[in-house]
Amino acid sequence: MPDFYETDVQINEYLVFHYANIEQTLPWKFGPHQALGFHTRLAECIDSSQLPEKSRALDLGCAVGRTSFELSRFCSEVLGIDFSHGFIDTANNILHSGEIPLVLKREGQLGDAVTNKLPEGVHPERVSFLQGDAEALPDSIGRFDAITFANVLDRLPHPRHALEKLAEITNPGAQLVVCSPFTWLDEFTIAEERLGGFKQNGEEVISHDSIVSILEKHFTLKATCDLPFLIREHERKFKFAIAQTSVWTRLTS
């Protein structure tokens, strides 16, 4: 994966995406307000009432960690994994300090430095972070009762392989949430490895259909939805995307 996600600019952008409040993220009365609070909405795709008492959760592609902390509200143990060393170092700093220093860029080199706190009700003591590859997860991480796999597939060289490995790290009855806007780019995934967005034998291949064909061997599809999200670049420029989302339950046999 390119070093794009190791730069200070991207780390700060993701800190704002994960931890800035509503007013800090979108300081306008107009705009896509439904796209705010993505990480909270993502974690809420997990039905906490169906988890075992001592549940383990994996936030695969955790970036700087917000979903991991949201999962800690109802999971006894949460592991966040990301390929970016910079993201994981930043997430660990937040874990240990409880503080999030970030810059709200306004224009050019102008911006406002602020320090936010972790949201109320999360349990940092339940959370840990690990640098790792979604395509080559270590056996030592064990199995999980809940997994969020968000906005990562279209940044992997071999997304099919990553999906196929999920069955090996989930307990029977485990819940899995997979979401992606499917922004396939050559710098991350060559055309031959993509899940969709092309024609094969004259027929359109859609990424969601490929995900279903891969996962249905070991999981049951429970629901699909669209999760919008908004990334602030600066005060007057934002990235708006819609992640196609599917919720799954691991088969018990």
Model-predicted segments: where are they?
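S-adenosyl-L-methionine
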Residues: N93-E135
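Conserved alpha-helix/loop element of class I SAM-dependent methyltransferases that forms part
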Residues: P32-K54
